[in-house]
A protein has these predicted regions:
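Short alpha-helical DNA-recognition segment
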Residues: 22-41, 60
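Residues within the helices of the helix-turn-helix
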Residues: 15, 26, 55
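DNA major-groove recognition helix of helix-turn-helix/homeodomain DNA-binding modules
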Residues: 33, 50-67
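Short, charged recognition helix plus adjacent turn
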Residues: 69-104
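Residue-level signal for the short linker/turn that defines the boundary of a DNA-recognition helix
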Residues: 12, 22-23, 49-52
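Residue-level detection of the helix-turn-helix DNA-binding "recognition helix"
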Residues: 19, 33, 44-46, 55, ...
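A short, Lys/Arg-rich alpha-helix, primarily the initiator
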Residues: 1-20
Length: 104
């Protein structure tokens, strides 16, 4: 059976932080303006947290917003490349890195 997780890093991270603070999924769903089933899918990696929700999560969990945003962005890269051949994934990442470096 194929793994249903599209976003593999961010969901488990926010789940771990929620459990560490003893919060319920319902509470987080409310904070983010969504429902519990959708929030559950976010934690499972089946749905992506919206960019504007990341700062809210960082504030709630009292974690560095840049660190959480970096993880969120990396998750997007993972989702875009996850089904590609390994060498193609790595080449694409290297090329993107070169492009970003040339822009600075």
């Amino acid at each position: 059976m194929k793994d249903k997780r599209i976003y593999g890093m961010f969901g488990p991270k926010i789940r771990a932080m929620r459990l560490e603070q003893g919060l319920k999924q319902r509470q987080l769903a409310e904070l983010l303006g969504t429902d519990k089933p959708m929030y559950s899918k976010m934690e499972l990696g089946a749905r992506r947290v919206r960019r504007d929700q990341v700062p809210k999560l960082a504030e709630l969990y009292k974690v560095d917003e840049k660190e959480l945003m970096t993880l969120w962005l990396a998750d997007g890269v993972y989702a875009a490349l996850r089904e590609e051949d390994e060498s193609l994934r790595l080449d694409a990442i290297d090329l993107a890195k070169e492009y970003f470096m040339a822009q600075n």
